[in-house]
Regions:
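Generic structural motif recognizing short loop/turn segments at the entrances and edges of beta-strands
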Residues: 1-3, 74
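C-terminal cap of thioredoxin/glutaredoxin-like
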Residues: 3-6, 12-32, 106, 110-200
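Structural alpha/beta surface segment adjacent to cysteine/selenocysteine redox centers
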Residues: 11, 17-115
Length: 200
């Protein structure tokens, strides 16, 4: 039977970007279906945005992020990020792509690479359109669909699913009720999908 992985992430999460290729390779190896849920950090469940952490913890977070980026072979660009606009519309396009049966994963990867790898302003309509087109999707129709009720309903549904499942930080992965938080938990997710016992 095909296994399903509920994948909770946001384009604003550098950890989702850093772990994306490793996660998708894992899912492919297990022939698992990925069900995407584009959500924010859930503070009521204990999630903490990096900007709200104490300076020393934030400094360590930054160092660890760079370590993992190097380990995963991905580029991070932090210069000029303060000028970037709201990326929520780009996330809506990813949701829209999934709902329409388009290649949402290619689009999410393209947005991640643009936002975190090159510090592009994916909140800008013209930048979104270019990236969407380069990912092989129809940017005009997708933008129109993303503004519709189906996408709003799906976002609300995903957030409620995440809240009830105990998701707090991003990325998170759930397989049959078992929650794994963070891209550094992928080895545990791999073992779980193999049917291995993780807790004695």
């Amino acid at each position: 039977m095909t296994q399903k992985i509920d994948y909770f992430f946001g384009l604003g999460s550098p950890w989702a970007y850093v772990g994306l290729d490793a996660f998708t390779a894992l899912a492919t190896a297990h022939l698992a279906d990925i069900v995407p849920h584009v959500i924010p950090v859930i503070e009521e469940n204990g999630g903490i945005y990096s900007r709200n952490r104490p300076p020393l913890r934030r400094a360590y977070w930054f160092t660890d992020l760079k370590r993992w980026a190097n380990r995963r072979g991905v580029t991070l660009e932090f210069a000029g990020r303060e000028a970037l606009s709201d990326i929520a519309p780009a996330g809506d396009l990813v949701v829209a792509a999934w709902l329409r049966g388009d290649d949402w994963l290619a689009l999410a990867r393209a947005f991640h690479q643009a936002f975190w790898g090159r510090a592009e302003d994916i909140g800008a309509a013209d930048v979104r359109a270019r990236i969407t087109t380069e990912a092989g999707l129809d940017s005009v129709s997708l933008e129109a669909f993303a503004k519709g009720p189906e996408v709003a309903a799906r976002k609300a549904e995903s957030l409620e699913i995440a809240r009830k499942a105990g998701v707090f930080g991003l990325p998170s992965y759930i397989v049959v009720g078992e929650l794994f938080w963070g891209q550094d938990s992928l080895p545990f997710l791999d073992s779980h999908l193999k049917g291995e016992k993780l807790i004695a």
